[in-house]
């Protein structure tokens, strides 16, 4: 299972390498890359099964951000796991936001990785189509409400502008928190912005 790691933190790189080798992946199948351009070059030449990358490696640079977005689109058979940079906030979950893209906390455990990579580790060359994790999606109403919420509108403002009851707004907020698996507004905003950076945003169910 060819794997690439792009992370500035040596502890994370060592931890991931140790985890992968303990699960039977050979060291020569694990490649460390230092930049988005370097990752693009490697993905073009060998099409890795899994890529782990830290958002800090690209999110602050428009060019790197664009390259990562392009890489994810051009490699639909590769699973990309992006670690969020969240300072002093407890969040230990992971979310599938596209068929081949997961956004994860750095607090992810080996047990969590076993769940995510079970088919990869078992078959070594499986495709993302065999991932059993559900893909995060919001209803059109939830999506519209979330944008207003992120723009700083309170429940009463959202209620008035969307012409719905305040308790319905609260219910939608509860659904969003449940789907994103956190009650922390800062984490929700972070996940939404990161998803928008590298995709067209959280998927919206138009039905």
From Swiss-Prot:
State the Gene3D superfamilies in the record. Winged helix-like DNA-binding domain superfamily/Winged helix DNA-binding domain (1.10.10.10)
State one molecular function term (GO): DNA binding
GO BP annotations of the record are: regulation of DNA-templated transcription
Write the record's keywords in alphabetical order, separated by commas: DNA-binding, Sensory transduction, Transcription, Transcription regulation
Residue stretches spanning the membrane: none
Q: Which residues bind DNA?
A: 155-174
SMART domains in alphabetical order: HTH_LUXR
Give a single Pfam family match: GerE
Q: Which domain of life is it from?
A: Bacteria
Residue span(s) of domain HTH luxR-type: 131-196
Which InterPro entries does the entry mention? RcsA, Sig_transdc_resp-reg_C-effctor, Tscrpt_reg_LuxR_C, WH-like_DNA-bd_sf
> Any idea what job this protein has?
Component of the Rcs signaling system, which controls transcription of numerous genes. Binds to DNA to regulate expression of genes.
- HAMAP family reported for this sequence: RcsA (MF_00982)
Family (UniProt): Belongs to the RcsA family.
Task: Return the protein name.
Answer: Transcriptional regulatory protein RcsA
């Amino acid at each position: 299972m060819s794997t690439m790691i792009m992370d500035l933190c040596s502890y994370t790189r060592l931890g991931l390498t140790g985890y992968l080798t303990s699960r039977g992946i050979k060291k020569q199948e694990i490649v460390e890359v230092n930049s988005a351009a370097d990752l693009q070059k490697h993905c073009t030449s060998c099409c890795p099964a899994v890529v782990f990358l830290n958002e800090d490696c690209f999110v602050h640079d428009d060019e790197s951000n664009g390259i990562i977005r392009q890489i994810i689109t051009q490699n639909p058979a590769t699973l990309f796991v992006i670690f969020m940079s969240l300072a002093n906030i407890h969040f230990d979950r992971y979310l599938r936001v596209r068929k081949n893209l997961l956004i994860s906390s750095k607090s992810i455990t080996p047990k969590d990785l076993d769940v995510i990579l079970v088919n990869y580790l078992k078959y070594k060359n499986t495709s993302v189509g065999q991932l059993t994790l559900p893909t995060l999606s919001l209803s059109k109403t939830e999506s519209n409400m979330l944008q207003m919420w992120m723009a700083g509108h309170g429940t009463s403002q959202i209620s008035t502008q969307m012409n719905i009851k305040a308790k319905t707004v609260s219910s939608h907020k509860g659904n969003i928190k449940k789907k994103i698996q956190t009650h922390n507004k800062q984490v929700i905003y972070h996940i939404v912005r990161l998803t928008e950076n590298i995709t067209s945003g959280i998927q919206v169910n138009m039905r």
